[in-house]
């Protein structure tokens, strides 16, 4: 008789839990959220220590992520615009990926302040930064998927890619991707608001039960299942094609890149997904007690922060692995940064000019930079 009730309990465990993309310190508080008296012993579950740890750790971590991520993604945008001129579909996707990361990063200083204090920016700013956070988050995932498909077409279906991989098609798919990212973010924006609780203002989502369930399922599908399926399918085809390629150097270079993409992605996001899984099935797995809940709160803060640092790695993985791109970056610093720091070095600038003219041509430069992804 007990076994017959397992499936309904399992389904209920899936649909009765929701998780925010925000840190646990600003987790959603709705009618279905855990209260201090929800546990069997009737004793309150005080999470003061969890909040204190978050107040100490999250602000400096978010600040570092913001600084390194902002600088890295701005460099990607500058190089793509000034050197590459956005002449290929890969460039378009790289540009939009950097924009997604920047939208995501722009909210981090405010979440850093909120982790250490109350929310002081009002309801409108609460919705605005929530929207930027979600749009940047989903946009980043979607453009990683597009970049993966772009590499798949370029390597596995090279003839078809000559017609399909155009700048126009890249712009169209990018616009559609942004629209989808906005729609995916709407539930979080609509149901997020600033409230006053216990003499402090908070900013977080207040989902009705139905929308909470929908948001949880949609987020798991779009941010975990879909990208994993695309990566497995596309990179399996890419590896199969590359292992038949006679160009050993090109093959090994592409394999190293694919290996780096997959390893870094799983390294930064697998811990968060594991903690998210445990939290989702917390009641079903018999872990619904205060001690476990506090440990999961702490783990969620740490692993989600680790996942957010992935936006700092994107410029390295998707741009700077190309040798020509690194040379573009070196020349950019020599030509623009060093020019302001050392105006009395004519020999230095002649060397830079020679490198620019001899190393890069419109034909080879554009082709080699795209090899980075």
Swiss-Prot record:
Disulfide bonds join 126-203. It comes from the Eukaryota. N-glycosylated. One of its GO terms (biological process) is homeostasis of number of cells within a tissue. Keywords: Cell membrane, Disulfide bond, G-protein coupled receptor, Glycoprotein, Inflammatory response, Membrane, Phosphoprotein, Receptor, Transducer, Transmembrane, Transmembrane helix. It is found in: Cell membrane. Gene3D superfamilies: Rhodopsin 7-helix transmembrane proteins. The modification Phosphotyrosine is found at residue 152. Induction: In animals in which experimental allergic encephalomyelitis (EAE) has been induced. One of its GO terms (cellular component) is perikaryon. Residues 82-91, 150-170, 242-256, 323-373 are cytoplasmic. The chain crosses the membrane at residues 61-81, 92-112, 129-149, 171-191, 221-241, 257-277, 302-322. Key functional receptor for CCL2 but can also bind CCL7 and CCL12. Its binding with CCL2 on monocytes and macrophages mediates chemotaxis and migration induction through the activation of the PI3K cascade, the small G protein Rac and lamellipodium protrusion. Also acts as a receptor for the beta-defensin DEFB106A/DEFB106B. Regulates the expression of T-cell inflammatory cytokines and T-cell differentiation, promoting the differentiation of T-cells into T-helper 17 cells (Th17) during inflammation. Interacts with ARRB1. Interacts (via extracellular N-terminal region) with beta-defensin DEFB106A/DEFB106B; this interaction may preferentially require specific tyrosine sulfation on CCR2. Interacts with NUP85; the interaction is required for CCR2 clusters formation on the cell membrane and CCR2 signaling. This is C-C chemokine receptor type 2. It comes from Rattus norvegicus (Rat). The lineage of its organism: Eukaryota, Metazoa, Chordata, Craniata, Vertebrata.
